[in-house]
Amino acid sequence: MGAERLKVIIVGGSIAGLTLAHCLDKAGIDYVVLEKRKEITHQEGASILILPHGGRILDQLGMFHSLSQYTEPLHAAHISYPDGFTHTNRSPQVLTDRFGIPLILVERRNLLKVLYNSLPDQSLVQLGKKVVSLNHHNGQVTVTVDDGNVYEGDLVVGADGVHSRVRDEVWRLSDAIRSGTVKDKEKKSMSIEYACIFGISNGVSGLVAGEQVASLNKGRSFLTFPGRDGRVFWFLMHKLDKNYTYPGAPRWSPEDAERIAARYIDDHIWNGVQFKDIWDKREVCGITNLEENIFQTWHSGRVLCLGDSMHKMAPNTGQGANCAMEDAALLANYLRHYLDGQKTAAKPSQEDLNTLFEKFSRDRINRLQSIYKMSRIVVRLHAGRNLFLRLMGRYYLPNTGDVPANQASKSIASGIYLDYLPLPTYSAPGWQDFAPNSKLFSGSLLLIMSVALLFGVICWAGRDIHPLSMKILALLGNYVSQ
């Protein structure tokens, strides 16, 4: 690769940013990470679900097993409904058996701790560096931070989250080249319909480690993940009074979280456990808006954004962090391919980076569309947003067998991995059986939902006098998912 190595400036010590640092290190590409906070592992009470495609990337980087000390693998999924009906499925265990990697829930700070502590050179992560501006200069890009220091590199990657400063700079740089390049419609395309209170509690009896619970209700839902040592990770998704446009959503305080929680304090979670039992034993909690969007403009010049800065979805499907890690892996793949294909040590021109960035963003948008749509459906289904989704949640989901696992398997098997590192060997068939070119990959989400609506109405109209309809619904649901 020559004496002068490519240098990447990563803005944001996030999951995406630190994963990218590892990927670049393995690819032999220089980097520096600029993080505005004074510490990497700030305690927020947030937790992250690692699905097999995200776990595979972490495994390639040698970190997945380091997370096991913090986690209890998921093996069962319960659903409870406001009418008292409950349902249990084995989707987490099915996915583990199919892909050879357990589904694990880990505190966000512990994942960041593992990512940070396992870096070969932690001095390359610069803390307390808030970005002020980005500028192009003589085939390089410079980043100025609030303490006056200036960093120079060949490209900048914004991994600085949903409130991204780098995204603002991408828009500014694009408009400086040609006014109106980024339309106001795109700048206002991120919406907020739900807020989330999240936290960690301890000593809650009645919940079993490794058995997740989705508690559905009208206008809100709970996701509960009992973990190791009596700890419980939980989320309360709450529908707002209207659909807001970013950044115009309400700002929340701890008092707001207490006020909202009090409204649902008697809601049933599972096995006699009420939300009160979890809330009263909270160790830490927070509240945040659930932004939703996939932006279309990911780059300008030598600057590219990824992770939550470009795609943000509700936590109900657990895909957010996994998709961010995929972003990091794919970008590292493309940069490595570029360098391997060069006959000289010349660094990438602006035209080279435009081509690479455009391919990267198109490939990621294409991959993310179905994942994003599913996350939008699931958060609204869990909160019973309309009659169709309430029918689907109550009468279709409990009778679908492995349909949810099959849908998840398709997105998992299509996941990105680091193509310049060895793939872990798993004696599990799911990676091949649910690959995009396999027979099991075919099937239409729209068709599934249409069948769900038709037979949900039949079941709802007759309530308990149509058990045959429910069986037919389950059979058709399994059929159309294949």
Swiss-Prot record:
Residues of this chain annotated as glycosylated in UniProt: N243
Job of this protein: FAD-dependent monooxygenase; part of the cluster that mediates the biosynthesis of shearones, diterpenoid pyrones (DPs) which are structurally diverse meroterpenoids consisting of a diterpene linked by a pyrone, and which may exhibit a range of bioactivities. Within the pathway, esdpE takes part to the biosynthesis of the molecular scaffold by catalyzing the formation of an (S)-epoxide ring at the terminal olefin of the geranylgeranyl group.
Database matches in InterPro entries: FAD-bd (IPR002938), FAD/NAD-bd_sf (IPR036188), FAD_mOase_fung (IPR050562)
Cofactor list: FAD
Pathway(s) served: Secondary metabolite biosynthesis; terpenoid biosynthesis
Alphabetic keyword roster: FAD, Flavoprotein, Glycoprotein, Membrane, Monooxygenase, Oxidoreductase, Signal, Transmembrane, Transmembrane helix
Organism: Penicillium shearii (Eupenicillium shearii)
Principal location class: membrane
Biotech utility: Shearone derivatives produced by this cluster are interesting candidates for Alzheimer's disease (AD) therapy since they moderately inhibit aggregation of amyloid beta 42 (Abeta42).
GO molecular function: FAD binding; monooxygenase activity
EC number: 1.-.-.-
Alphabetical list of Pfam families matching this protein: FAD_binding_3 (PF01494)
Primary enzyme class: oxidoreductase
PANTHER family: FAD-BINDING DOMAIN-CONTAINING PROTEIN-RELATED, FAD-DEPENDENT MONOOXYGENASE ASQG-RELATED
Annotated family: Belongs to the paxM FAD-dependent monooxygenase family.
Topological type in the membrane: Single-pass membrane protein
Signal peptide bounds: 1-21
Keyword Membrane: yes
Residues that span the membrane, as ranges: 440-460
Protein name per its UniProtKB record: FAD-dependent monooxygenase esdpE
